[in-house]
Structures are given as C-alpha cells and as structure tokens.
Swiss-Prot record:
It comes from Bordetella parapertussis (strain 12822 / ATCC BAA-587 / NCTC 13253). One of its GO terms (molecular function) is lyase activity. The lineage of its organism: Bacteria, Pseudomonadati, Pseudomonadota, Betaproteobacteria, Burkholderiales. Pfam families: D-Glu_cyclase. The keyword Cell wall biogenesis/degradation does not apply. Signal peptide: none annotated. Keywords: Lyase. This is Putative hydro-lyase BPP3031. Belongs to the D-glutamate cyclase family.
Amino acid sequence: MRRPVPYHRVAAIMTILSLAGAGHQARLDARGGMLTGPTANLAPGHVQANLAILPQAVAGDFLRFCQRNPKPCPLLAVSEPGDPSLPELGLDIDIRTDVPRYRVWRDGKLVDEPLDVRGLWRDDLVAFLIGCSFSFEEAMLENGLPVRHIEQGCNVPMYRTNIATHPAGPFSGPLVVSMRPLKAADAIRAIQVTSRFPSVHGAPVHLGDPALIGIADLGRPDYGDAVEIRAGEIPVFWACGVTPQSVVAAVRPEFCITHAPGHMLVTDLLNSRLAAF
C-alpha cells in the first residue's frame, strides 16, 4: 500500500506550482496585450530579464561582450538561432510576444516600440537574456529598504555614464546604471543585500556624487523616470542591463531588438535560486 504524501511536501509542491504560474501568467498577459507597462514588483519572487536580439553574424561577438562585462550583462540564457523558445527560463516562452514592449533598432537608430515582434522575426536571430535588478529589489524590500520607483509607481531611473565597458569585436560603449536613493545606513545594507545576487548585477558600482561618473542631472534620466530624492538620502547606482541599448546606439548593427527599458521578460525562475550565499 502506498503511503500518503506528507502534507508539508504537498504544500511545498503547490507553492512552487503557484509561483511558476505567476510568471507564466505575466507572460500570457504580455502576449495578449494586457500587460504593456513596466514590470517592477510584478510577479514577486520571479527572476526578470533584459533582452537583446541580434543576427547570428554578430552574436558571437556580443556573447564575448557579455562575458567581459558581467556586471551590466550577466547572462541568464542564450537562444538557438531562429528559435523563439527559452525552455530553461520558463514554460511556453515565446520571446517574440512575451515582453510587454520592445524596441526595434536599425543601423543603431530606434525606429519602433511594438508590443510584439513576430512580424520581424528571422531565422538568424539569437536572443540574449540578461539579469535584471528588479530581481534583487525583492530582497531589498524584504530587508526593509525603500525602493523609490516602486513607491512612486513609475519606472526606475537609468543613466549613461562615463564608465567604459570592455570591448569585444565591434561592441563597446558606455556603462548604463540604474539609481535608487537611500539613506547612508540603508545604502550600506543595500550593498550587503545585493552582493548576494551577482547574476542580477550584484553590488552597486557607485554611490554619492553622480558627476564623478558623468551624470549631470539626476532629474533627467536617459531612460525611465526621475524619482524623488529626499533630505538625507544619497543616490546609489547599480550596473544596468540597458547597457546593450547604449552600445547598440554606438555600434549601429544593421538590426537589433531589445526590451523597452523597464519592460522585462518575467521568467519562471525564482529569485531565491539566484542568491550566491
């Protein structure tokens, strides 16, 4: 006679299935045009990913670029040429439809921001999925650290810097950073918390004076939305997965598709699985 499965194991299995379902539902909502906005704090517990899609002819160089720049470009997955599925990241993923908003680039110029890219898909396209700081924000919130853009219901502010990335083939350009204002004591705690997640950018690359990294005005981000910086707070900057978009603008490949900043692929992976310690 088979012994019944203990309740705690059933509960654990149901929790895992429920969590996976939240990521899948977010993708279905994007696929159906019901999710078109930023994904910060969406499907809590789930890994979110930045996207860059390039022709196979330059994919090898871009792979090396990511390997040489793991802070802004921590790779989570790479697709096979022409294959829009990414089974290692989740059930039934179609990278052509499951991101809330895309950007289309031709010769380095942004030409469109569609909700799906099925009509642009080619057999030679390779998708790169890159870790996103939205994943470590869950850990920040759990540790009582404020995340201002979530509080204000807007997109995270992102800025191009004067910090150069390490080139690979034709790919080179400035590092892009995301910014979250924190009190000094909270900034120290944020360093400790985010250091546990190197596959989603890890610890900050700079805190304090933005001019030292080439940012002239925090009120005018290059991507995303400006947020309030309150008395006693300092800006804290993390390497950002939008860096490939600044590189695309500089390198001007003949064709490229990216996510719109802040509009991520929500995966079935759990943030807890990415913690290094």
